[in-house]
Amino acid sequence: MFLLNEQDVLKTYDFELGFAPTGHKQVEGDGRTPEGAYYIDRKNPNSRFYLSIGISYPNNRDRARAAAMGQSPGGDIFIHGTPKRFRREPDWTWGCLAVKDREMEDIYAMVNIGTPIFLYP
Protein backbone atom coordinates (compact mmCIF):
# COMPACT_ATOMS: atom_id res chain seq x y z
CA MET A 1 0.00 0.00 0.00
CA PHE A 2 1.33 3.44 -0.92
CA LEU A 3 0.58 6.68 0.90
CA LEU A 4 0.86 9.50 -1.63
CA ASN A 5 1.00 13.28 -1.62
CA GLU A 6 -0.02 14.18 -5.17
CA GLN A 7 2.27 11.86 -7.19
CA ASP A 8 4.97 11.47 -4.53
CA VAL A 9 5.13 8.26 -2.50
CA LEU A 10 5.49 9.25 1.16
CA LYS A 11 5.39 5.77 2.68
CA THR A 12 4.95 2.15 1.67
CA TYR A 13 3.14 -0.38 3.88
CA ASP A 14 2.62 -4.12 3.88
CA PHE A 15 -0.95 -5.12 4.74
CA GLU A 16 -3.20 -8.12 5.29
CA LEU A 17 -6.56 -8.86 3.66
CA GLY A 18 -9.47 -11.23 4.33
CA PHE A 19 -9.77 -14.94 3.46
CA ALA A 20 -10.65 -14.21 -0.20
CA PRO A 21 -8.10 -11.57 -1.16
CA THR A 22 -8.62 -11.59 -4.94
CA GLY A 23 -11.45 -9.90 -6.80
CA HIS A 24 -13.73 -6.99 -5.99
CA LYS A 25 -16.03 -7.27 -2.98
CA GLN A 26 -19.49 -8.26 -4.24
CA VAL A 27 -21.64 -9.07 -1.20
CA GLU A 28 -21.54 -9.12 2.57
CA GLY A 29 -19.51 -11.99 3.95
CA ASP A 30 -17.56 -12.80 0.79
CA GLY A 31 -14.22 -12.06 2.52
CA ARG A 32 -13.11 -9.73 -0.24
CA THR A 33 -11.87 -6.16 -0.10
CA PRO A 34 -13.43 -3.53 -2.39
CA GLU A 35 -11.50 -2.52 -5.49
CA GLY A 36 -11.82 0.87 -7.14
CA ALA A 37 -11.98 4.55 -6.25
CA TYR A 38 -13.39 5.46 -2.83
CA TYR A 39 -12.63 8.07 -0.17
CA ILE A 40 -11.96 8.15 3.57
CA ASP A 41 -15.33 8.80 5.20
CA ARG A 42 -14.60 8.51 8.93
CA LYS A 43 -11.87 8.12 11.53
CA ASN A 44 -12.21 6.13 14.74
CA PRO A 45 -9.68 6.77 17.52
CA ASN A 46 -11.50 4.25 19.77
CA SER A 47 -11.51 1.32 17.36
CA ARG A 48 -11.36 -2.30 18.56
CA PHE A 49 -8.52 -2.50 16.03
CA TYR A 50 -6.23 0.12 17.61
CA LEU A 51 -7.06 3.00 15.23
CA SER A 52 -9.15 2.84 12.08
CA ILE A 53 -10.15 4.92 9.08
CA GLY A 54 -13.31 4.11 7.14
CA ILE A 55 -13.53 3.57 3.41
CA SER A 56 -16.66 4.81 1.62
CA TYR A 57 -17.72 1.32 0.48
CA PRO A 58 -20.39 0.62 -0.68
CA ASN A 59 -20.98 3.24 -3.34
CA ASN A 60 -24.10 3.37 -5.55
CA ARG A 61 -22.63 0.95 -8.10
CA ASP A 62 -21.71 -1.55 -5.35
CA ARG A 63 -25.25 -1.34 -3.91
CA ALA A 64 -26.83 -1.87 -7.34
CA ARG A 65 -24.60 -4.87 -8.09
CA ALA A 66 -25.45 -6.55 -4.79
CA ALA A 67 -29.17 -5.73 -5.15
CA ALA A 68 -29.17 -7.38 -8.59
CA MET A 69 -27.96 -10.53 -6.82
CA GLY A 70 -30.61 -10.12 -4.12
CA GLN A 71 -27.98 -9.56 -1.44
CA SER A 72 -26.46 -6.89 0.78
CA PRO A 73 -23.17 -5.36 -0.36
CA GLY A 74 -21.85 -5.31 3.21
CA GLY A 75 -20.01 -2.31 4.58
CA ASP A 76 -17.83 -1.08 7.43
CA ILE A 77 -14.61 -1.52 5.46
CA PHE A 78 -11.63 0.06 7.21
CA ILE A 79 -7.88 0.38 7.21
CA HIS A 80 -6.95 -0.55 10.76
CA GLY A 81 -4.34 -1.85 13.16
CA THR A 82 -4.52 -5.06 15.16
CA PRO A 83 -7.26 -5.94 17.65
CA LYS A 84 -6.62 -5.17 21.30
CA ARG A 85 -6.75 -8.92 22.02
CA PHE A 86 -5.13 -10.26 18.88
CA ARG A 87 -5.53 -13.90 17.90
CA ARG A 88 -4.42 -14.81 14.41
CA GLU A 89 -7.44 -16.37 12.74
CA PRO A 90 -8.00 -17.27 9.08
CA ASP A 91 -10.00 -14.08 8.48
CA TRP A 92 -9.38 -11.65 11.28
CA THR A 93 -9.61 -8.63 8.93
CA TRP A 94 -13.17 -9.41 7.68
CA GLY A 95 -12.40 -7.79 4.32
CA CYS A 96 -10.60 -4.75 5.72
CA LEU A 97 -6.96 -3.78 5.18
CA ALA A 98 -4.83 -4.37 8.27
CA VAL A 99 -1.44 -2.82 9.00
CA LYS A 100 0.86 -2.77 12.03
CA ASP A 101 -0.23 -0.47 14.85
CA ARG A 102 2.77 1.86 14.48
CA GLU A 103 2.05 2.19 10.77
CA MET A 104 -1.61 2.86 11.53
CA GLU A 105 -0.53 5.78 13.73
CA ASP A 106 1.27 7.33 10.73
CA ILE A 107 -1.62 6.73 8.35
CA TYR A 108 -4.19 8.03 10.85
CA ALA A 109 -2.19 11.23 11.40
CA MET A 110 -1.64 11.94 7.69
CA VAL A 111 -5.04 11.08 6.19
CA ASN A 112 -8.12 13.29 6.47
CA ILE A 113 -11.80 12.61 5.93
CA GLY A 114 -12.45 13.12 2.23
CA THR A 115 -9.02 11.84 1.16
CA PRO A 116 -9.36 9.74 -2.01
CA ILE A 117 -8.31 6.10 -1.79
CA PHE A 118 -7.69 3.87 -4.79
CA LEU A 119 -7.81 0.13 -4.15
CA TYR A 120 -6.41 -1.91 -7.02
CA PRO A 121 -4.62 -5.27 -7.22
What residue spans do the PLM features occupy?
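Gly/Thr-rich phosphate-binding beta-strand-loop-beta motif of the actin/hexokinase/Hsp70
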Residues: 1
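Short acidic-glycine loop/turn motifs at beta-strand connectors
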Residues: 4-9
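Electropositive
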Residues: 10-39
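Exported/periplasmic cell-wall-interacting domains
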Residues: 37-38, 42-121
